[in-house]
Design a protein with these regions (language model features):
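TOPRIM fold recognition
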Residues: 2-86
Length: 86
């Protein structure tokens, strides 16, 4: 599998979706890694609009565990401790 670990914000999910589109060309699947973690210690609150857009991406791609519930915070991957995928 191809894992992607990115920021928990709209830009991070747009990058993830773009990578998925590219992977599909070769029949591959991208799996979000550590993008389903609750971000209570984030630096900035996400707007309702951004939460809606992120959730639309997650639903479209089947990444249901990554959907956000308001209020949600943006979080950069650099602020999280890395764990290796299985």
């Amino acid at each position: 599998p191809i894992y992607h670990w990115g920021d928990q914000d709209l830009g991070g999910f747009r990058i993830l979706e773009r990578l998925q589109r590219l992977a599909e060309v070769s029949g591959r699947q991208v799996t979000p890694w550590m993008m389903d973690q609750p971000a209570n210690e984030g630096r900035k609150a996400l707007s309702e609009s951004d939460i809606h857009k992120i959730n639309a991406i997650c639903e479209r791609r089947g990444w249901l565990s990554c959907r956000l519930t308001p209020p949600a915070m943006a979080r950069e991957q650099e602020s999280m401790e890395l764990r290796q995928p299985p």
